[in-house]
Design a protein with these regions (language model features):
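Acidic, metal-coordinating helix/loop segments flanking the phosphotransfer/catalytic sites
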Residues: 33-53
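Short amphipathic alpha-helix used as the core "switch/output" element in two-component signaling
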Residues: 66-77
Length: 137
């Protein structure tokens, strides 16, 4: 059983590569992609109980991933939102966490950690007792 995911990413090449790798390595099925804050926020709100994981880039074609993140504050406990950005500074990590991000990953240096986090979430979905370790960034 795959983890049902949404991807907010405006770079088509990055989105394509992430979708393929997430499915292959982590059993994460990306069911929709949005390139703007509006697209992402609307999809996540309209499908509020249908997703397990949202992966959000901070810089989108329109708006911000921080706005998407803020819109997910009232999500179910089982739903996770992670930020994937080229700008994972300490300030961005702090702000994203304050807005409810479960984790923040740097695109240039922490993709393996993102994949490990996603694999852990998939394992926990299949076996709620699995994956007792936590990857906080």
């Amino acid at each position: 059983m795959s983890l049902i995911s949404y991807l907010a990413e405006d770079n088509e090449a990055i989105a394509r590569n992430l979708i393929e790798t997430l499915q292959e390595i982590c059993e994460v099925k990306v069911v929709a992609v949005g390139a703007t804050q509006t697209e992402a926020s609307q999809w996540l709100a309209l499908h509020d109980s249908e997703w397990d994981l949202a992966i959000v880039d901070l810089f989108l074609k329109e708006g911000s991933g921080l706005g998407v993140l803020a819109g997910c504050r009232n999500r179910s406990f089982r739903q996770k939102v992670v930020v994937l950005t080229n700008y994972a500074t300490p300030e961005i990590r702090k702000r994203a966490t304050e807005l409810g991000a479960n984790a923040v990953f740097d695109k240039s240096s922490e993709l393996e950690q993102l994949f490990a986090y996603c694999a852990e979430q998939t394992a926990q979905r299949l076996d709620p007792g699995a994956g007792s370790g936590s990857l906080l960034h």
